[in-house]
Structures are given as C-alpha cells and as structure tokens.
Design a protein with these regions (language model features):
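Nucleotide phosphate-binding/pyrophosphate-handling subdomain across enzymes
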Residues: 11-12, 20-136, 158, 162-164
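C-terminal helical cap/extension that packs against the catalytic core
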Residues: 127-181
Length: 186
C-alpha cells in the first residue's frame, strides 16, 4: 500500500510524505489540491511497481509542473491570486473549487460557463456547485458552438440557489468584472 501523509496544501503546490512499507519519502509538487495529491500518489505507486525507487520518483517532482489550463496560476501584479482551470464536468469544477477554497484567505470568485453542443444536464449541476463552493460566481459564455449562449447561461443559472452570482455573457467582460471585484487575499 502507498499512502500520502502530513499533507500541506499551499497556493504554489503541495508537500507530503509518501509512505510505502518501511519507507517515507518527502514529495514537493507544484500541483495544488487534494485531487492532485491523489493523482501524484497513483503515479508514484505505478512507477514504484515498475521498479523505480521512491527517491528517484520524488526527485522528478522537483521540476515545476505546469499543465496549461489545469489549476494553472496566472501571475499578475495584484494582491490576489488568479487561476485557470478547464473544469468541464460537475466533479472537475467541484474539485477545483474545493482545492482553491483551501488555499484562499479571502473570497473565492469564479468565472465560468459551459460549452455548447455538450451534455445539457450537467449545466444546472455545475451552477449549483459553483454557487455552493464560491463566494461569488460570474456566469459567462464558453464556446457555445452552434447553441444560443443565452440558453446555455439560463441552463446554468437554473441550478443556482444563491443570489451571489452575476451574468456577463461576454467572457472578457466577465473576467474584467471578476478582477475589478477582487481584493487582497482573494
């Protein structure tokens, strides 16, 4: 069995000990969120079972890991943090928001939309999850394809129970609004 212990989640990554049999090896990765700790643990276990030492595996995480659009930090000159995540399912959105909530000192503001010509049933669920885990939600358009962007937004908003959301169909304007509302620690 492989286990991740003494987990520390930070805005610039995660630190934890990997335990297997009588070994404990520290791992530091630039990936944030518990779901990435689990993903890292699975990768470690797979490599170890193929004969790679835990120490060698741990060293591979020393290099920065940036996966474009996956919990990717956007560095801007501001007293708050900005992340981009491709979360396109209810579970992915929830995982991203839970991870960000754990490292956010202030409010969690999310800008999101759902793509067109895709599963319509997930839209209200994603709206509900966003409203549940974020302090403020800005619903916007996200590649509507051949669908009416306003119809997609209506589907999303139908699942939202909180009043803490805005609808800004133009994505650039939605992002600008989020940035203008963010404060130190958000």
């Amino acid at each position: 069995d492989y286990a991740a212990k003494d987990i520390v989640l930070q805005e610039n990554g995660s630190e934890f000990l990997i335990e297997h049999k009588d070994k404990k090896v520290p791992v530091r990765t630039g990936l944030i969120g518990m779901f990435n700790v689990y993903n890292t643990l699975a990768a470690v276990a797979a490599a170890a079972e193929l004969g790679v030492s835990l120490e060698d595996i741990a060293r591979t995480f020393d290099a920065p890991i940036v996966i474009p659009g996956r919990m990717e930090r956007v560095f801007i000159k501001a007293p708050f943090s900005v992340y981009v995540d491709y979360a396109h399912t209810p579970q992915a959105l929830t995982s991203a928001l839970v991870a960000l909530r754990k490292i956010t000192r202030g409010r969690l503001i999310v800008v999101f939309g759902c793509g067109g010509d895709r599963d319509k049933e997930k839209r209200p669920v994603m709206g509900k999850n966003a409203a549940r885990f974020a302090d403020e939600v800005i619903v916007t358009s996200d590649n509507p394809r051949k669908e009416d962007p306003e119809a997609i937004i209506r589907d999303i908003v139908a699942g939202m129970e909180k009043d803490t959301f805005s609808v800004v169909p133009d994505r650039r304007d939605a992002i600008k609004l989020a940035l203008s509302r963010a404060h130190e620690g958000d």
